[in-house]
Amino acid sequence: MQDIQLDKRLSELLSQAVTPQNAQPLMQALCQSLNEHNIRYYVDDAPSITDSEYDRLMQRLKQLEAEYPQFVAADSPTQRVGGMALAKFEQITHLKPMLSLDNAFDEADFSAFHKRVSDRVGEVSFCCEPKLDGLAVSILYRNGVLERAATRGDGTVGEDITENVKTIKSIPLKLRGDNYPELVEVRGEAFMPKAAFEALNERARLKDEKLFVNPRNAAAGSLRQLDSKITASRALSFYAYALGVVEPTSHELAKTHYEQLQQLKSWGLPVSSEIKVCDELSQVFAYYQDILTRRADLPFEIDGVVMKVNDIAQQQTLGFVAKSPRWAIAYKFPAQEEMTLLEGVDFQVGRTGAVTPVARLKPVFVGGVTVSNATLHNADEIERLGVMVGDTVIIRRAGDVIPQIVAIVPERRPEDAKAIAFPQHCPVCGSLVERLEGEAVTRCSGGLFCEAQRKEAIKHFASRKALDIDGMGDKIVEQLIDKELVQSPADLFKLTASMMTMLDRMGMKSATNLAQAIEAAKTTTLPRFLYALGIREVGEATAANLATHFGSLEALRVATIEQLIQVEDIGEVVAQHVAHFFAQPHNLEVIDALITAGVNWPTIAAPSADEQPLKGQTWVLTGTLNQLNRNDAKAQLQALGAKVAGSVSKNTDCLVAGEAAGSKLAKAQELGVKVIGEDELLALLANS
């Protein structure tokens, strides 16, 4: 109740015009709110607002303090770094304060920072690095041996997490070599990689335990475990980003920040491979855009990039203000999480009959776009979140990922909030819905009787990766079904140009072009045909593996589950889906109707070992290929027996690097994976 009253009071004050009379109570309310959110974020590991909303409140307080300096409070969050040491850990006073960074939110902000710096010290270069979304850590080495580790805490006093830090495998217990100082403090970020975060939450989900909202909370919670065995099980990582205290001070250190990071690396400390020195302002902005573009593909969460004056002498000249260095700034990305209101829930039916709840949201700008809908996945997810209509929810949108609700803000729940009821009947056709034992998804039982499944199945059949009917977009498919011109995939091949002129905004010329595209699509490949059928969990790669293994549709139709499991990358679940599909009479009728309509493909000869020289190898494609379509390259590699993966790992045999290859290339080089260019790939394909 106190939280609700605090938010209500703050909202009332923020809605008023600021005057000398009400400025002080507004600033006090902002301080109180921000300090409360600091405790939730740093102490409880349970934030109730997003980073972007916190930033907005902080910016508002800074503006007011600049305008009314006489009202600046001693407990204002602008007067300290932020965060508190937990009493349950031994408290450690830092040998040198661990300060935070000022923020830039756009090019104008950074340009102003650049001008302030260059006005003081002249021409500058910047060492640029990703701003990891984890927990700042100080690690003290004495005579090369890890002696102590602490959190940043409030910047002056932190928490002793030595035993927990020792469990992070990427942190050396003893420095490499012998050219390090007698005493050296290493500062960096402890974080949880995305893959480790997903695995941690999956384990929690199976045990019906509370899930972490994001990797940052998971990392913070893991480092604050009293039992270091729990920390050890959490697969944390660490990147060093600066030197702290060094004794003796006479020890020779590198003269630039970038070179000091390389020194740290030479001592055995992990340093990000994404660090780059930029000499021009335009290079800084290009670096920012490059990292922003690749943000979703990076193996760790970041919320911006950090720009530091590279020359150490210039850093010393610039010095510090009360809570941050003058020589560094965090250039923040657009927020990936925002808070908004859940106004209602709709239920959509997909091509496989899956009934998916979709949240209707009060529109909010997040991840670079305005979001008004978000997936709720299934009934289990609704129950896990405890979400109700009317709740204030936290929305996350990362890269091209569909926006989703990751948490609710329980203290903002209104009294008239309504529970979300899953329908008992299909919202499209009225058929009963069913949920099979062991499955999370609820499905409509109507099959092709259900218009939604019919529409989505035919859209999928005509899509680019399936039969690739040029010009057959979603809206045209919907019209064809609405006007009862098409009831099944085979009906597409009965369409004539004159029939399609019945569609909205479809003249004879466009109809003729579409009719020709339909005719051309009759000649396809067996992998595309199998993918087009929409068999559950059979994507492009699985369809290609099935076609390669069995060689013909006839052989696949009669394959047993035991035979299907022999196919590369097919387990028992997918094998059951495939066998079940071909056991259904109505599916066989659809296939026969398509073949009768003239759909055909060249015969695939069962490959010999000589024809699959890449069998057992894992390949990855990255960058832009100029002479070969990415999907064609993937298909040809698969035909040679290769598995084509989406990410580089120690199990990768070869990376094909096209133009503008980014993090995958760097990862491959780091792991010693073989790298070839497009010309070498073309030569390989030509000779195989």
Curated annotation (Swiss-Prot):
Positions of the BRCT domain: 609-688
InterPro entries: BRCT_dom, BRCT_dom_sf, DisA/LigA_HHH, DNA_ligase, DNA_ligase_AS, DNA_ligase_CS, DNAligase_adenylation, DNAligase_N
Primary enzyme class: ligase
CDD domains, per database record: BRCT_DNA_ligase_like (cd17748), LIGANc (cd00114)
Keyword Ligase belongs to the record: yes
Residues at the catalytic site: K131
Cofactor requirement: Mg(2+); Mn(2+)
PROSITE patterns according to UniProt: BRCT, DNA_LIGASE_N1, DNA_LIGASE_N2
Coiled coil start-end: none
Entry's Gene Ontology BP terms: DNA repair; DNA replication
GO molecular function, one term: DNA binding
Enzyme Commission number: 6.5.1.2
Name of the protein in question: DNA ligase
